[in-house]
């Protein structure tokens, strides 16, 4: 798909090139119960009031989700005009813009258009500039065109014919919009990788597969990859991580991926991703219904690897280290049992009261390992708790942090990236739920505040650096008819790193 930019100030009569240029379709936004403005007004003038007549006749009322194609329109070079309802102008926010862009792409992809002129990026959205609109629109398009067909013997070819999109932007935003295209394509490629890894079955996407994926990213983009095997993990005394991996025939891997975009002495941001490639729950076995979705329990790892690919493609001026502890959580004769006590890399002993609370057991050793990089910040990403799904559903990722400044940066990035997160409490009082009579701490704290106590557990291993935890159990994948990985929170993480890099 080819994307390009053309600056245009509709208010100064600079639209001639758009009006006469050859295109299969021009996309226009129509607000509900508002007079025409911007691109819609200029094209209405060029077509001698056609848009106004269509609106007046009630064929396009501007309500959100409405679309109308106009064919063989005289006065312009495009063979079609697509009108997209935007809803009420005073309620037109980032979500409404994304909905409008998605609606437009769905309508266009169902036709045989090849080249499209897209004017929606210039709409007023929460004081965002049109370069923001370009990036959001490209991500919406790539989301609509994503298909996972790797495991089908005869995959159906793409049904759409769209190949080129020209975005009209405010002239002052033209340079930034070109950067936005590069960022959006890199983000989409990273999200596609994350989704592919999540959607692959557990018998394909094994710990070794994730390790090989990291090596491929390193080879393709000039990164440095280290993949530690069982003996090396044992030498590091990662007893907590190994307690989860011990019953699986798939050997555990500990992946470390280095991206250097800044001076070698600059402290890196460390991303840690939970990589349970299949989670049965272990001896604390999960119910059979829906267990197939536990292939998605490595989406934290997938999102970290996808983010690293995106960062490398964007060429961000920042140092980033990705750490992925990865294994399966299986039952077996040598599996960890409820009540067993294991020793973490940090030296803390952990009473494993529930083997299905395994994500925190592999993450805690990775968080300890992260200390050696003297990081500027550490962010772990995990499909950690069903309790977070109960609390926040599938819209917001749960954000926990012991550092207010870091939490603020991540929340700002989530809003900019349209990848919502909600900060959750992490009060010291919750730590009491992790007390054990027999070890330094237990791996669960009971049913109350389950997402919070899971984060509290992780916080015990993060005292030496600014730390945040993203619980993506509700946002990493969707179930039902639309089952599949979402690619989140790659946009949030990438935006955070873009902001940190000052780009």
From Swiss-Prot:
Reactions the enzyme catalyzes: Release of an N-terminal amino acid, Xaa-|-Yaa-, in which Xaa is preferably Leu, but may be other amino acids including Pro although not Arg or Lys, and Yaa may be Pro. Amino acid amides and methyl esters are also readily hydrolyzed, but rates on arylamides are exceedingly low; Release of an N-terminal amino acid, preferentially leucine, but not glutamic or aspartic acids
GO cellular component, one term: cytoplasm
InterPro entries: Leucine_aapep/pepB, Macro_dom-like, Peptidase_M17_C, Peptidase_M17_leu_NH2_pept, Peptidase_M17_N
Cofactor note: Binds 2 manganese ions per subunit.
GO MF terms held by the record: manganese ion binding; metalloaminopeptidase activity
Enzyme class per UniProt: hydrolase
UniProt keyword annotation of Protease present: yes
Cofactor entry: Mn(2+)
Family to which this protein belongs: Belongs to the peptidase M17 family.
Function as written in the Swiss-Prot or TrEMBL entry: Presumably involved in the processing and regular turnover of intracellular proteins. Catalyzes the removal of unsubstituted N-terminal amino acids from various peptides.
Protein name, UniProt field: Probable cytosol aminopeptidase
Organism of derivation: Burkholderia cenocepacia (strain HI2424)
């Amino acid at each position: 798909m080819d994307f390009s930019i053309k600056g245009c100030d509709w208010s100064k009569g600079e639209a001639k090139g758009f009006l006469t240029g050859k295109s299969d379709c021009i996309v226009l936004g129509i607000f509900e119960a508002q007079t025409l403005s911007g691109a819609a007004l200029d094209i209405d003038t060029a077509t001698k009031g056609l848009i106004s007549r269509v609106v007046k006749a009630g064929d396009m009322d501007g309500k959100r989700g409405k679309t109308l194609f106009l064919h063989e329109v005289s006065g312009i070079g495009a063979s079609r005009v697509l009108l997209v309802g935007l809803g009420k102008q005073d309620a037109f926010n980032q979500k409404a813009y994304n909905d409008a862009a998605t609606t437009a792409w769905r309508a266009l992809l169902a036709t045989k258009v090849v080249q499209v002129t897209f004017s929606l990026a210039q709409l007023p959205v929460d004081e965002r500039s049109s370069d923001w609109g370009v990036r959001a629109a490209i991500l919406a398009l790539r989301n609509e065109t994503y298909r996972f067909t790797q495991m089908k013997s005869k995959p159906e070819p793409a049904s759409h014919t769209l190949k080129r999109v020209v975005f009209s932007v405010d002239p002052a935003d033209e340079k930034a919009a070109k950067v936005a295209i590069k960022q959006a394509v890199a983000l989409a490629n990273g999200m596609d990788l994350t989704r592919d890894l999540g959607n692959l079955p557990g018998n394909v996407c094994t710990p070794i597969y994730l390790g090989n994926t990291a090596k491929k990213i390193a080879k393709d983009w000039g990164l440095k990859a280290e993949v530690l095997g069982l003996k090396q993990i044992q030498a590091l005394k990662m007893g907590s991580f190994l307690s989860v991996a011990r019953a699986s025939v798939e050997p555990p891997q500990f992946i470390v991926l280095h991206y250097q975009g800044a001076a070698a002495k600059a402290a890196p941001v460390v991303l840690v991703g939970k990589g349970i490639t299949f989670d049965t729950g272990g001896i604390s076995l999960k119910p059979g219904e829906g267990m197939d979705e536990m292939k998605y329990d490595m989406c934290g790892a997938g999102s970290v690897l996808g983010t690293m690919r995106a960062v490398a493609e964007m060429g961000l001026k920042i140092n980033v280290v990705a750490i992925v502890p990865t294994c399966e959580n299986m039952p077996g004769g040598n599996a960890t049992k409820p009540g067993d006590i294991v020793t973490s890399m940090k030296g803390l002993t952990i009473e494993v009261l529930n083997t299905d609370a395994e994500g925190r057991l592999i993450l805690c050793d990775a968080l300890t390992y992260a200390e050696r990089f003297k990081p500027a910040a550490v962010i772990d990403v995990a499909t950690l708790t069903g309790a977070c799904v109960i609390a926040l559903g599938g819209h917001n990722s749960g954000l926990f942090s012991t550092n207010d400044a870091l939490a603020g940066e991540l929340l700002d990035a989530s809003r900019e990236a349209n990848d919502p997160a909600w900060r959750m409490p992490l009060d010291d009082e919750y730590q009491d739920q992790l007390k054990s009579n027999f070890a330094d701490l237990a791996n669960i704290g009971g049913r109350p505040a389950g997402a919070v106590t899971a984060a509290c557990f992780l916080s015990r291993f993060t005292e030496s650096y600014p730390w945040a935890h993203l619980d993506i159990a509700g946002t990493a994948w969707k179930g039902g008819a639309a089952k599949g990985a979402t690619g989140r929170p790659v946009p949030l993480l990438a935006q955070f790193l873009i902001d940190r890099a000052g780009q």
